[in-house]
Amino acid sequence: MSKKPTTKKEVQTTGHQWDGIEELNTPLPRWWLWTFYATIIWGVAYSIAMPAWPIFSDKATPGLLGSSTRADVEKDIAKFAEMNKAVEEKLVATDLTAIAADPELVTYTRNAGAAVFRTWCAQCHGAGAGGNTGFPSLLDGDWLHGGAIETIYTNVKHGIRDPLDPDTLLVANMPAHLTDELLEPAQIDEVVQYVLQISGQPADEVKATAGQQIFAENCASCHGEDAKGLVEMGAPNLTDGIWLYGGDVATLTSTIQYGRGGVMPSWSWAADGAKPRLSEAQIRAVASYVHSLGGGQ
């Protein structure tokens, strides 16, 4: 007896065909579909229970559970602020020069000051305080405005040439000797050669000799007769090979031609009713930290 032939339902195709190869319209597995539906349900439920939809101008929907990571962070900040309240009050009440003699304050300022520095100062002065072009190193003892802790504190608090703070350190910008027609291009070239010479770099002897006289007449009033700089003017030492903007011919020429005048922001200034950028304790902590890095005077 012959067996009854079995018929197997063929899977339909999508109708797409490439070089004789057809795309089957195979149904997705049930487990996959149910998992997909479950994720949709979970997503809707999560968006209802937790903050999710930014339909308000300043915040998202709060969610039925009222969870807020921002509120959690604020609680943690408040908790640690309360823990540090006593030592911060002590720091504010202690004379700046006496901080280094107090082990508790030394420990606190090294940690808190480092945190402040990494948050607010490292963008310009570098993560290790080694400086960047246009932003001085805080490690080498080559200070434009002085490295005593009181000076560091004042400069952090009120900034340098900050137009917003009336108590900022106002020192004159370096003149633009070419733009302001103070020197001719040939004279600038001679001064550049002189600066190269006194900083220990190869220089044209003839031009350097002529540049020495021009320097004495136009530059010594800020940089000093010996070119070692004057803290009162914020003018750098030109003999030690430490350069804020660069000591090559092109950079020196540009500096003399167009001048320089860096700005450091005031970290205590605030608009009326606004909160200062840094608190008094934070300013003291970071000033003490910077002073302890090795370059403090």
Swiss-Prot record:
Primary localisation category: membrane
InterPro entries referenced in this protein's UniProt entry, alphabetically: CcoP_N (IPR032858), CcoP_N_sf (IPR038414), Cyt_c-like_dom (IPR009056), Cyt_c-like_dom_sf (IPR036909), Cyt_c_oxidase_cbb3_su3 (IPR004678), Cytochrome_c_Oxidase_Subunit (IPR050597)
Segments in the Periplasmic topological domain: 57-297
Biological process per Gene Ontology, one example term: proton transmembrane transport
Listed cofactors: heme c
GO molecular function: electron transfer activity; heme binding; metal ion binding; oxidoreductase activity
Keywords: Cell inner membrane, Cell membrane, Electron transport, Heme, Hydrogen ion transport, Ion transport, Iron, Membrane, Metal-binding, Oxidoreductase, Repeat, Respiratory chain, Transmembrane, Transmembrane helix, Transport
Cofactor: record remark: Binds 2 heme C groups per subunit.
Cytochrome c domain location: 108-199, 206-294
Pathway(s) per entry: Energy metabolism; oxidative phosphorylation
Sites where the protein binds heme c 1: 121, 124-125, 264
Location of this chain's protein in the cell: Cell inner membrane
One term under GO cellular component: plasma membrane
Subunit record text: Component of the cbb3-type cytochrome c oxidase at least composed of CcoN, CcoO, CcoQ and CcoP. Interacts with CcoQ.
Name this protein carries in UniProt: Cbb3-type cytochrome c oxidase subunit CcoP
Gene source species: Rhodobacter capsulatus
Upper taxonomic lineage: Bacteria, Pseudomonadati, Pseudomonadota, Alphaproteobacteria, Rhodobacterales
Gene: ccoP
